Structure formats: C-alpha cells, structure tokens
Amino acid sequence: MPTMIKKDDKAMEPPNEKPHRKIERDDVPESSNHIPPPESGVLKGGKVNSKTRALKAVTSIIADADENPQKKVNNETNGVQKQKTEDLSKRIGKFEYLFYKFLLVLLYICFGLFRYGQYQYNKMKLRIFSIIYNHAYTPQLIRQDVIPLKKIPKRLAAILEVKPVGDVGGGVTGLLNDASEIVCWTVSAGIKHLMLYDYDGILQRNVPELRMEIHSNLAKYFGPAHVPNYAVKIPHSNKIFYNLDGIETETDVGNEIEANQEKDKIAIEISLLSNRDGRETIVDLTKTMAELCAVNELSVSDITMDLVDSELKQLVGPEPDLLLYFGPSLDLQGFPPWHIRLTEFYWEKDNNEVIYSVFIRGLRQYAGCKVNVGK
C-alpha cells in the first residue's frame, strides 16, 4: 500500500514570496457597469459591516414596512374621495346641461311666439293699409293721394326680385307685371323718372315683353285711347325704346337731336338697371381713366370727384330721391352704391308683394323727411 506523503504547508509555498492575505469584501472594487439593487442605496457611503450602517439599514426597512400600510390606506381613501367628487361633478354637469337646454328651448319658444305675433300684426297692418289706399285702377284716386303731400320725388327707384314660379305672381311674367304696375302708379303720381332694378337683369333681357305689359296696364288705367307715352332706357347697352301713340320705335342714345325731341313728348322715362350697373361700372370707369392716364390723354390732376360723378351719371343715370323695396327687410342687392348717397329708403316689414300701399306710404314718408347735405 503506497505510503501517503504528508506535505508541509510551508514547503508548498513558492520561495521568496509572501504568504497569501485574506481578501476582505470591501476591498473588491465594483465594476463601473454594475447596477446596484435598490437596497444597496441604503448601504452606500461606507463599509457594509459597520454597525452604524447596519442599524440604519434595519431601521429604514422597519420604517418602510410601517409606512406602506398607512400609505395604502391613504391612497384608498383619496381614491374613494376622488371617485365621489367625479360622480358629483358628472351629476352637476348633467343637471347644468339639462337646465341650460331647457332655458334655451324656453327662450326659443318665447321668441317664436313673439315673432309670430309680430308677423301677424304686420300682415294685418298691411291689409288695413291696402283697404285705406285703394287706387281701383284709377289715376284720379292716385292723384288725390299725392296732392296733399308737400313734395314728391323727382326720381323714383324700385328694387324688384323674381319670385318662385309656383308662387302667386311668380316667374318672369309676375316680375313684368309688377314692373308695369309701378310704372302706372308713377305716371299717375306725376313722377317723370323711374329706375327699375333687378339683380339678374331679367327686365333688360325681356324689353319687348316689358313694353307690351306696360302698354297693356297703362291702357287699363288711362284707357286705350289715352295711353301716355313712355321711354325704356338701358344704360348698359346705350339704347332707348320709345312708345309714341302705340307705335314702338328704337333710338340709339348717340342720336342726341332725335332723342331730345322725343324725350320732351314722353310722360315717363324708365331706366332698367342690374348688378352690372353697380360696382362693375365703377371698376370699368376706373380702368378706363387709368388707361387714359397711361397714354397721357388724361392728366391725374383732371380726375376729380365732379368728373367721376358726371361720368357715372352719364353711364347709369341721376341719383334717385326715393328708393322703394318690396321685401320683408331692406336688401339693396348690389344697387349702384354711387347713386344712393342722399336717397331716402322705404320698405314694409314682413311684406313680399308689390302693392300700392307701400308705394304711397313711401311717398308720404319722403314728403315728411328733411335732407341735410353735409350736415
């Protein structure tokens, strides 16, 4: 049996070397990439085996264990209170929504009832005025309504619009009839200048039909043998259509002598306007003046307010003294803005018909108004 050789520990040590020293835990350097666990934060800053640090660590753990249940209870209490607050806010918000909705509906109903009453009142007033001011297709009755007035307009304008075809007096035929009725009232009142404005220019495109309608209604008012002479003027196309003793003729505006001779014989001059005669005319005039200035045919110093005013009067016509609108609320619909600086407006609320009572009441209002130029 082989003999076990017992080696001496000292003999195993390499020569000339110091004996190994026991390495303590705190002497081992930590890696720079090492992420310590959360618990090591309590032990940071000194030796682990120090009694003070160990006592602090144990105390901190015990304190955390005592605080966690208290925090949990507080969090649960706060959650319950927050939930109650949210529920209360939802209930209050729903109540406010229902309250304001009810208030809005109530206000809407009150306004609707008020507006309905106002509409019926205005309609009843118009019916009463229609009974009081009834011309009965007689020029003498119209003259009797006009004679008491202190003054009447020299130039009258009216804004007309096309109604739906399905309505009474709708379509192009209704528009032509309304225009001819206003012409008859104007002639009977002794007014010699009338402007008829419709936005789309339907009257300008239907001049032959309009002249026939005017002649027919004038014959109804004055009799077939005493139809007044009239002239229909279209400023945009520089044309004037005359009707003399039932004979219709067409005269170009450029023929001044013939136009002036026939103008003295007519009872009324009717100008047909559209949106083309409004702002577009002012723009075209401005472009023309700019082109003349560019070629030195017109000096900038020559462009004055009087020049612009005279040119617009020649292109569109003079400014009317009274403007009638046969609609529920005033809507100028692009009427030439240059020509209404001193014009008196008149319309009846909730009215959408061309009726004589609006015409004569407009004249009565003009007779009582005072125009202060520049004051």
From Swiss-Prot:
Q: Which Gene3D superfamilies match?
A: Decaprenyl diphosphate synthase-like
Q: E.C. number, please?
A: 2.5.1.87
In this chain, composition skew of type Basic and acidic residues spans 1-28
| UniProt pathway | Protein modification; protein glycosylation
Superkingdom is Eukaryota
Annotated Gene Ontology MF terms?
A: ditrans,polycis-polyprenyl diphosphate synthase [(2E,6E)-farnesyl diphosphate specific] activity
Topology class, membrane: Single-pass membrane protein
Q: Which GO terms describe its biological process?
A: dolichol biosynthetic process; protein glycosylation
Compartments reported by the entry: Endoplasmic reticulum membrane; Lipid droplet; Nucleus membrane
GO CC, alphabetical: dehydrodolichyl diphosphate synthase complex; endoplasmic reticulum; endoplasmic reticulum membrane; lipid droplet; nuclear envelope; nuclear membrane
Q: Does Cell wall biogenesis/degradation appear among the keywords? A: no
Q: Which residues cross the membrane?
A: 97-119
Cofactors named for this entry:
Mg(2+)
Into which family does the record put it?
A: Belongs to the UPP synthase family.
Give the protein's recorded name. Dehydrodolichyl diphosphate synthase complex subunit NUS1
Q: Which organism is it from?
A: Saccharomyces cerevisiae (strain ATCC 204508 / S288c) (Baker's yeast)
